[in-house]
Structures are given as C-alpha cells and as structure tokens.
Amino acid sequence: MLQDKGLSESEEAFRAPGPALGEASNTSTTNAPEPALATPGLSGAALSSPPGQGADVAAAAAAAAEQTIENIKVGLHEKELWKKFHEAGTEMIITKAGRRMFPSYKVKVTGMNPKTKYILLIDIVPADDHRYKFCDNKWMVAGKAEPAMPGRLYVHPDSPATGAHWMRQLVSFQKLKLTNNHLDPFGHIILNSMHKYQPRLHIVKADENNAFGSKNTAFCTHVFPETSFISVTSYQNHKITQLKIENNPFAKGFRGSDDSDLRVARLQSKEYPVISKSIMRQRLVSSQLSAKPDVSPLHSAHQALQHYQYENGAHMQFAAAEPQDLPLNTFPTQRDSSLFYHCLKRRDSARHLDLPCKRSYLETPSSVGDDHYFRSPPPYDQQMLSPSYCSEVTPREACMYSSSGPEIAGVSAVDDLPPPPLSCNMWTSVSPYTSYSVQTMETVPYQPFPAHFTATTVMPRLPTIAAQSAQPPGNAHFSVYNQLSQSQVRERGPSASFPRERGLPGMCERKPPSPHLNTANEFLYSQSFSLTRESSLQYHSGMGTVENWTDG
C-alpha cells in the first residue's frame, strides 16, 4: 500500500505497487506526511512557544492538509462507454511511433483547495503477470508475462496548476500515447503487446518549488477498473472494432473515407459542373454540322457551349455576352451515331482525293450522291459481304489498289472475283519444282503474261499467300501452267527457238489469246498474285532451255 511507503525524491516512488485490482472498494489511496514534518517552517516557532501551543498549531496544520487530500473526488468521464468496452474486452493499439488511447482518459475533479497547486499525472502498470492470446472469440492466458518495461509517468501539460484551474473543466489525457518501442525518445509510455494493463491517476500537491518527490509530499491515487485494457498491434475482437467505428470520429481507416461522397455533394451544389471531354467534342462536331455555311466554326462552338445537358438531367446555361445574337441550342440526350460516322468518312475521303496521285481518277464522276453519306450505315455483315460497298471504296482508294477501269488480258475485275480460300494445304496437289522436267515437253505454246512481262506497277487487291506456301510461288505457277496447257502442246505448228528478252513483249501481244488460256489466267490471277520479280526471273531461266517454241 502507498500509505505504508514514503516517497523518495525521484519518480520511482510512483512505481510502487498500488491497490489490488480486484478490490473495487479501494479505488483511491492517500498519503499524508508526519505532523512534525508537515510544517518544517513552524519548527522554530514551536520551539519558542509553549509546548502545548506549538503541538496544537502543528496538529491543526497537518489536519488541514490531510483533510484537503481526502476531500478530492475524481469521476471518470464517459463511464458508460468505458463499461461497454470493458464488457467486450478493451483493446488499445500500440505502435512504434505511438498511438493515442480511445476512449480517451478524461476525469472530473472536485474537492480541491482553490489556491493550492496540484500536479496530475498518469502511469500504466501491468494488471497481472500473464500473456494473453485471442482464441475462439475470447481472450485466453497464453503464458507468463514478459519482463515489464521501465515505468514512465505522463504528467499533464497544465501541471502544476491551482485547484480552481483543475476543477473548472474536464481534465483530459488525450495526448497520452502508447508505444512498443523500447528505445522511444519521446516520452511515450512503453508497453508490451498482448499484455493487460491498468491506468492509474495520481494527484500530487506541489511543493514550494512547484515540484513533487520530496519526503513530505501529499498525494492520492485513483484507479478505475473499467479502464483496464489489453495492448495489441491490431484489433483482435471485431466487437471492439465496431465500437471504435461507432464512437471514434477519427476512425477513418475502418469506417471508409467519405471524401468521395462529400466531393459529389459539392459537385452537385456547384453552379457549373464538370463535363467530360468526349461529350463536349461530339457536341462541337454536331453543332458545326447543324450550323449554316456562312457561320464560322467558332460561332458554332460557342453555340454548343451556350447550353448543354448534364448527366443528372439538370440544364445549365453558360453566361453569354450577347444572348440575343446566339440562339439557344439544346443538345439532345440520344444522338444518332451514323451522322457522326459518315461525316468523318466524307471528310477523310475528301482529304485523300486532294493527293496528286488521285487526280487522274477524278475525271470520272462518282455515281454515289452526297446524300448517301447521311443515311444510316448498313449492318456489319453487309459491309463485309456487299459488292456495292466494295465498288464504292475502289475508286476512292485507287492509289492503294490496282484499277477499277477496263480488264487486263481477259481477266475480270478484281472486286468481282471471290476471295480465294486460304489454307495450309492449298499447294499439296501441285507437283514440286524438283520433279518437273522441261525436256519432257515437245512444244510449249506462248501466251502473254502481263503480270510477268510488263512493269509490275499495278497489283491486284487480294491478300498475299506467299507466306503460306511450302515452295516458291513461281514454281507453283509454272506447274499449274504446265498442267493446264499440256493438252494443247501437240496442236501447235512448227517450233521456234526461244531467244527472247524481257524488253520484247510487243511481238507476242499481236496474237489473240485462246479462251482456254484465259481461263488459266483467271485461275492464276486468283491463286498467285503475290509473285515478285525474283519469281519472274526464275520463270525465264527455266523456259530458256526449251528448244522449240511457237507463236501459234
């Protein structure tokens, strides 16, 4: 008991064990000095006065001092809240940097001498010698407690102060912080995790030096059992977490940030809410389309910004310098996407037609009217399969594709041909080049091949298939030609030598092509349009070994 021990001149005196936590009746203790030691200043007067009179003065002074300490009453603020936490098992977070307690330790003090100065301080002592663990939704003893940390005292920042100051309002220790850093240099109270502790409040009468710790210091200690807690690094019991959320206004980490809700509320209350850039861009384009030709784009943009509809349905209007000159133009909520799509397509086509390489194709007027671009677009399947769509694109993109004019050497238009089926096995039926022998042919009829002997400046608009073949396309071309024309070899006349150069295709073009080879040319054009100049050279080197050649 603190009554049986005198206080030393250091703060170690407050580390003495207090009353047992189980004794609910002994919630406060007092310590009064000896009568003779309580009035050291009166010792000389007592010696000079009669013996009976000096003893009476000392006894009266000691009784007054003892009565003052005993009359101090302390009440715990928010006691009902503390009881709720205590019933669930109060937990207090401890961190390296220090964490404040919640509920905060606040008391109401009465019965002090208004003119006497007091010092209020708190220490936190172990409640028992056990270590705890939270298992099966309850706290259980896990073993023996770790050695206690050196005790620290938290002195209230207002100390020392008169009794009138302390009794004027609540005394709050909300700035007290708990830490598990054993080397903490900030004066926080050091605790061990998963241990049970009991806070204690000490009221000390200040001496003539406004300090405490002298041998004749009077003090009292108040303990509230409902303020005991278990120190943890994170909350273990969900009930404690819920109580913290419901009662702690600063528990943002658990409640969830309401900043987004507040931001939305402020946004709705603003006069000019923010709208997305994509919506404004579409409205500007549509306003330019609806504007007259003599109206400038800036004027149209101003009309679009003059009035708009926000997402929540409320109509907002920008302040205009001359509202009578700018008509109100409300933009509809549902916009036709086809209008925007065809407008961009027409503008891109016009930009491509301005190129020099397209001027030769502008002589023939397009059969498609301008009103075609303002109709709703056909479905996706029709766009991919409709031949009219292909014929529409061909003259406008003539720089990329071969030609939409007359047919070449009896070959039909490229757009009219169906796309060839692409397959990895399309060359399996063709004999390889190594098995082909030129000497087996007696005579080979010659027919013009514009793709080989003319300048390769025009290329058909068909996908290349050179990468999918197992052999060079030139070899396959020659094999196919052999298969199709071998039946006509013996029907030709006298043979001729084949000393032909690449620069003499004019002599061959005078002969009309046979209908059978026209069919072969159509097949060749549909299957091997990715032939390069290297394949053409291979073809000429192979044909140079033929002895007899006829012009038909």
From Swiss-Prot:
It is found in: Nucleus. InterPro entries: p53-like_TF_DNA-bd_sf, T-box_DNA-bd, T-box_sf, TF_T-box, TF_T-box_CS. Keywords: Developmental protein, DNA-binding, Nucleus, Phosphoprotein, Transcription, Transcription regulation. It holds the Pfam family T-box. It comes from the Eukaryota. GO terms for biological process: angiogenesis; embryonic hindlimb morphogenesis; embryonic limb morphogenesis; embryonic lung development; limb morphogenesis; lung development; morphogenesis of an epithelium; positive regulation of DNA-templated transcription. It comes from Mus musculus. This is T-box transcription factor TBX4.
